[in-house]
């Protein structure tokens, strides 16, 4: 299974590199450039976060409740653990962003993860982050959060939560495929 996951990751990276090469080639060939973005980083991130929420929740809902304990190999998290991990990390990153304590409560720790609870936690974590993002102004993007060795600017925290979530959602999509379930289609 690990080889299949590594192969899939390699295919995704290759596709990204090919797309970047085509974009560079088109730009060098004199293709028209898109209009300058005047929305600002926070507005743009919020738009993509909303899309990501829909995709992540759709992935969580696609797996039958009976398969939430499915693990492709023993050393991996179960599907339910992946979903709860996304929720916990979302809460953690966004609490860090607002200098607050994470409201995440791991009700499933050392217990069977129920689908309904996992989807509820996941949805709540996206809403929590959306509210946290809306409190950050463009002027505050370079504000430092954290203490000691754990200091990050707001922009890094916001990008970090997105990257972390996408990484684990991608893993969850592979779990769906391994169970013979087509993951939800990507929506822009």
What are these regions (language model features)?
Residues 59, 111-146, 153-166:
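Acidic/histidine-rich alpha-helical segments that form the ligand environment
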Residues 6-20:
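Bacterial N-terminal signal peptides
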Residues 20-33:
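Sec-dependent signal peptide cleavage junction
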Residues 1-5:
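Positively charged n-region of N-terminal signal peptides that target proteins for export
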Residues 31-46:
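Short, low-complexity N-terminal intrinsically disordered segments enriched in polar/charged residues
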Residues 46-50, 54-57, 67-107, 146-188:
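Short, contiguous alpha-helical
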């Amino acid at each position: 299974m690990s080889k299949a996951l590594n192969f899939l990751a390699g295919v995704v990276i290759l596709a990204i590199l090919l797309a970047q090469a085509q974009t560079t080639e088109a730009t060098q060939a004199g293709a028209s450039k898109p209009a300058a973005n005047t929305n600002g980083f926070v507005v743009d991130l919020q738009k993509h976060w909303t899309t990501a929420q829909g995709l992540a929740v759709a992935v969580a809902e696609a797996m039958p409740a009976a398969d939430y304990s499915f693990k492709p190999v023993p050393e991996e998290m179960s599907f339910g653990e992946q979903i709860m991990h996304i929720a916990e990390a979302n809460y953690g990153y966004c609490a860090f962003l607002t200098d607050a304590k994470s409201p995440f409560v791991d009700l499933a720790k050392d217990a069977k993860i129920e689908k309904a609870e996992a989807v509820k936690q996941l949805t709540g974590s996206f809403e929590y982050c959306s509210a946290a993002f809306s409190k950050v102004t463009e002027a505050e993007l370079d504000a430092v959060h954290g203490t000691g060795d754990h200091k990050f600017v707001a922009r890094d925290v916001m990008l970090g939560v997105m990257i972390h979530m996408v990484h684990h959602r991608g893993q969850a999509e592979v779990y769906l495929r391994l169970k013979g379930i087509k993951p939800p289609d990507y929506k822009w």
